[in-house]
Structure formats: C-alpha cells, structure tokens
Amino acid sequence: MVTVNENYLLLKSSYIFSEINRRVEEFQRKNPDADIIRMGIGDVTRPLPEAVVEAFHRAVDEMAEEETFRGYGPEQGYPFLREAIAENDYASRGVDITADEIFISDGAKCDTGNIQEIFGLDNVVAVTDPVYPVYVESNVMAGRAGPADDDGRYSGLVYLPCTEENSFIPSLPEERVDLIYLCYPNNPTGTTLTEKQLAEWVDYARDSGSLILFDAAYEAYIQEDGIPHSIYEVEGAREVAIEFRSFSKNAGFTGTRCAFTVVPEELEVPDSSGRMHSVRELWNRRQTTKFNGVSYPVQRAAEAVYTPEGQREIRESIDYYMENARIIRESLERAGLRYYGGVNAPYIWIRTPEGMDSWQFFDTLLNDAEVVGTPGSGFGPSGEGYFRLTAFNSFRNTVKAMERISELSF
C-alpha cells in the first residue's frame, strides 16, 4: 500500500504567502470594488530591461532556424553565461571564482531548497529567526527538523534569534551545527552584515567544520560602503561557503526564471568513514540527475544583464525600487512606527503597534487601508510582533499605500 512521506505532515498548515492570498481573496469577494495594493510578496513590477528583451528576441529567432536551433543544453549552464558571471560579479570585485564553479538554475528558491539533498540527514541545521521559510520547510520535508511546537519552532533545528535587542545580528551558535543558512542583505528584515561581522561566521565555520549556505539574492541593492556583496570577499570563505544569487530582483526575472549557485572547488565534506568528497561534484551529480538546465533564450537574456546597456538599465530599476523604500521609511516615521531595513535592501521590517500581533496588523492594513504586507510571524517565532513591506510595487502605488497607512491611528 502506498503511504505518505510523513515529514510533509510536519509542515505548518500553509505556506505563508498562500495564507495571505486566501485572506486577500476573501476580502476581495466581500469588497469587489476595493483597490488593494500589494506590498507583501517580493515580486517585481518593472518590465525586463530593453537590453535583456532584445537578447531574448535574438535567441528566440535562433531557435526558429535549423542552423542555430538548440535542444538540451548543459545542465550546469552555457559557458557564455557562466563566464560573464565570473567576470562581472566576482573578478570585478577582486574575487576569484571560475566559470566551472558556477551552476545556472531556474531560481535561488529552488537551489536553496534543493542544496540540502546532498548532505546527510544527521546534519544539524541552523537558521536565523526570522527566516525565509524555504530554508526551514525544505529541511522539514527531508526529515531533519522533527516536530514543531505551538510557536512553529521545529525541535531538530537550531534557531538564531534576530531581534531589536541584538540589532538583528545573529549570535554564533552555542551548540554544534553543521549547515548554517545566512541571507544578507536579509529577507525579511532588510538588514546587512559588515565584512567584519561576516568574517566572524566564516571563522566559526572554519573552526567548527560547518558549512555556510549564503543567500545573496539581494546584493545588488547594497548602497553603502563596507558591506560585502559576496561572502567570498571574506578570506577563507571558499573553504566553507556556498553562495546563491538570482536575476529575479536585480533584473526582473521573477517570471523569466534564472539564477546561479557558486560551489568552490576547495569545498569538501566527509562521509561517515571520514573520506572527503567534493561538494561541487556532488551538486553537479544532483543537478545532472534532476535538472535539465535553463533554456537557451533565458540564458542569453541573462547574459545581456552584463552589457553596459543592461547594467545601466538594471541600475535604473534598482534606484526606482530604492526610491520606493525611501518613501516607505519616511512615511513610517511620520506615522510613528519603528522600522528597520530599506537602506541596503528592498524590504522594510516594521515593529507592530503595541498590543497588536503581526496577523492583527495585517488585517488592520487590509481592512482599513486596503494594503497587503507580510506578517512577521510567518518568518519564524522571532518574527512575531513585526511586519514586512516591500518596495517592489510601482512608485504611484507605493505613494498611495503609504498615504493610506499614514492616515491610520496606531
């Protein structure tokens, strides 16, 4: 008889954004004329850059001709894109990453969720709290997390609280951990680590034999000096870290799907007998078995991001969204609400008004301002009492939403 993978039964009842959509749809049914402004899920609103679109068209035209048609491509990605990434994202910052260490994929969400498959189920996983849910839920599905308590805290995971009290900077684990998920600039808090702070994590991983899974999907939004764009800017990180990047938020690829993961050649992990194995080879084996690669037109489109025109156009989009973030911050100040982030990231992390939990604040904004954000409790126990807004809507909608919120009394 077929049975279910019971690890799936340990998942909380709903992925946070599914619950948000359910509540919004219910509100819309009851209020069909409502002008709802969505500032919750981190989806972009500006179109693809012109340089990207032109490259996309050219690649599609190639696919229409017998001489230039392409079928299955390399699972790791076409060399032209891997080389462009190595040169523009890493060599330009003095970081030594080769094209062979770069794996093209259809999204950082997929890669951060799938990477755990190549590691043993007895590995102890540490996550910052609040945390992007994919890191937690993929390990729940795999069987590493154990059951959850009433607060949604899984017994088998190590949580590293990030709160106002520690300026949202997690402390190094006191107990042994093997896999450490870090995301900076951070989703959901919008905060960052300095090079010195990140170096403490690299040193910890080198001393303890841990491995850092570093999500840098929002690095393009860094505005201030002294904040690393890549963990590999820190000495020794090649020995202890995997990095995830995405074209979704910097180049508008949320619907186009393209990202990449960097697995350095030096990175090795032992089996139960102590024999060392290349993580790059393990990830390559996983990808060649379960993934057929990103389409040729999409990879040509991603390559165009690195042209002078592409760089100028994505900078315009990033500046557009960061102007939205400035409007959000200033409006929250006028409303008397405490907030964090929104300077080096497109996310603003709001402290909910006293006596109001994060879902109550969600319902207040939805019902009284017709604005949708994301309750902090959906990102983990330490997210309770906080609320996330994103800067990814249009300028007009951002201004309108913040005017509505400013009119509320808290």
UniProtKB/Swiss-Prot annotation:
Modification N6-(pyridoxal phosphate)lysine, positions: 249
Domain of life of the source: Archaea
Identify the keywords attached in UniProt to this record, alphabetized: Aminotransferase, Pyridoxal phosphate, Transferase
Any GO BP annotation: lysine biosynthetic process via diaminopimelate, diaminopimelate-aminotransferase pathway
Q: Where does substrate bind?
A: 15, 42, 109, 132, 187, 292, 388
Q: Which reaction does it catalyse?
A: (2S,6S)-2,6-diaminopimelate + 2-oxoglutarate = (S)-2,3,4,5-tetrahydrodipicolinate + L-glutamate + H2O + H(+)
Q: In which pathway does it act?
A: Amino-acid biosynthesis; L-lysine biosynthesis via DAP pathway; LL-2,6-diaminopimelate from (S)-tetrahydrodipicolinate (aminotransferase route): step 1/1
* InterPro entries tied to this protein: Aminotransferase_I/II_large, DapL/ALD1, PyrdxlP-dep_Trfase, PyrdxlP-dep_Trfase_major, PyrdxlP-dep_Trfase_small
Q: Name a GO molecular-function annotation.
A: L,L-diaminopimelate aminotransferase activity
PANTHER family xref list:
AMINOTRANSFERASE
Known function: Involved in the synthesis of meso-diaminopimelate (m-DAP or DL-DAP), required for both lysine and peptidoglycan biosynthesis. Catalyzes the direct conversion of tetrahydrodipicolinate to LL-diaminopimelate. Is also able to catalyze the reverse reaction in vitro, i.e. the transamination of LL-diaminopimelate with 2-oxoglutarate to produce 2-oxo-6-aminopimelate (in equilibrium with tetrahydrodipicolinate) and glutamate.
Q: Which family does it belong to?
A: Belongs to the class-I pyridoxal-phosphate-dependent aminotransferase family. LL-diaminopimelate aminotransferase subfamily.
NCBIfam families, per the entry: DAPAT_plant (TIGR03542)
Q: What is this protein called?
A: LL-diaminopimelate aminotransferase
Cite the source lineage.
Archaea, Methanobacteriati, Methanobacteriota, Methanomada group, Methanobacteria
Report which gene this protein is encoded by. Answer: dapL
